[in-house]
Amino acid sequence: MAVNLQIPSESEILPVAGVEIGVAEAGIRKAGRRDLTVFRLAPGSAVAGVFTRNRFRAAPVQVCEAHLAQGGPIRALVVNTGNANAGTGAPGLKNAQDTCAALGKLLDVPAEQILPFSTGVILEPLPMDRLTAGLPAAVADLRADGWYGAAHGIMTTDTLPKIHSRRVNIGGKTVTITGISKGAGMIRPNMATMLGFLATDAGIAQPLLRQLAIELADVSFNRITVDGDTSTNDSFILIATGQAGVTVDSAGDAAYAALRDALAAAATDLAQKIVRDAEGATKFMTIRVEEAGNTEEALKVAYAVAHSPLVKTAFFASDPNLGRILAAIGYAGIDDLDVSRLRLWLGDVLVAVDGGRNPDYQEADGQRVMKQAEILVRIALGRGQVADTVYTCDFSHEYVTINADYRS
């Protein structure tokens, strides 16, 4: 059950000049399900990517990194769902390369100018016969307004498509930003998102785009977690087609800050949508750590709380057993933490002060907050002035059911 997940209507999704998308049913995931997506990018488009830090990197991730490292143009992307092409060794690597070659022939572009992406079951061979047979239909479907279909086409256990679209004024010009993401489980990206594609018709110089992709991932997709698992296939792609008549060459350009902020807002929304649609989620939780000595320790504490199964199940049950939060803070890895300076709020309710229970705290007040669909947990460490935030969800019975039945 998605938690307050707002999806724009198809008519509200804005095409990005220079991007065409086609979707097809290849039978990789399930019969009658769109599971193959192709992006075609106009000449002159700039592309940058950020990928999983999992050492068990999927074959398509390796191919993407190799193609981007060549420094040439990227003219197309191809995404399949239902199979991750991970844990497949040399044959899987060849399949990812062959996918690029097959699409390249259809689009008349070199294979090294294509980026492949896969998501789904790990340790299973990619069904190349079905994938390559589906490519012509995806290419035939290419159109500027293909974002809505693509958002559906990249889904796995997602219950709803995740789309963001907006227009902003940059340097007196109208700039369009549209993106999609997918993911509902195995989400602690530590780099980007499960799969995320964000495009703008502004022009951004390639070196700046690479740095911007890293920054956007860090403030958005690197701040979410569902279950603490980092996927083998996580990929975030940032595309700038340069069709809007606005070009940013350096971070010092007057237009850069406004464009960066608009892209960051889009990326953050796409990241939060993943948590709102997390497998079995009934609560959307914001874990904010304040008064930390640095960002690293703020995130250590936030993730310790966000990853704790005991904390997550307590929120599912609306059970104010909040000592579980204190325990998670204690094992977060800050060796010199002075717990006597710690304060904890649940929404507007002060639960703990000076490392112990607030004398005025009433459990009924805590439970009132925990029954809400969206919950803010604030933790003040009393160590400094740095703050950071992580977004997560509860663990429900449905999470276990979804993952137990995933391959059945």
Swiss-Prot record:
Catalytic activity, reaction form: N(2)-acetyl-L-ornithine + L-glutamate = N-acetyl-L-glutamate + L-ornithine; L-glutamate + acetyl-CoA = N-acetyl-L-glutamate + CoA + H(+)
Annotated positions binding substrate: 156, 182, 193, 279, 403, 408
First-listed, main subcellular location of the protein, grouped into a coarse class: cytoplasm
Database matches in Pfam families: ArgJ (PF01960)
Keyword Cytoplasm recorded: yes
Known partners and oligomeric status: Heterotetramer of two alpha and two beta chains.
PANTHER family: ARGININE BIOSYNTHESIS BIFUNCTIONAL PROTEIN ARGJ, ARGININE BIOSYNTHESIS BIFUNCTIONAL PROTEIN ARGJ, MITOCHONDRIAL
Name of the featured protein: Arginine biosynthesis bifunctional protein ArgJ
Organism: Bordetella pertussis (strain Tohama I / ATCC BAA-589 / NCTC 13251)
Gene coding for it: argJ
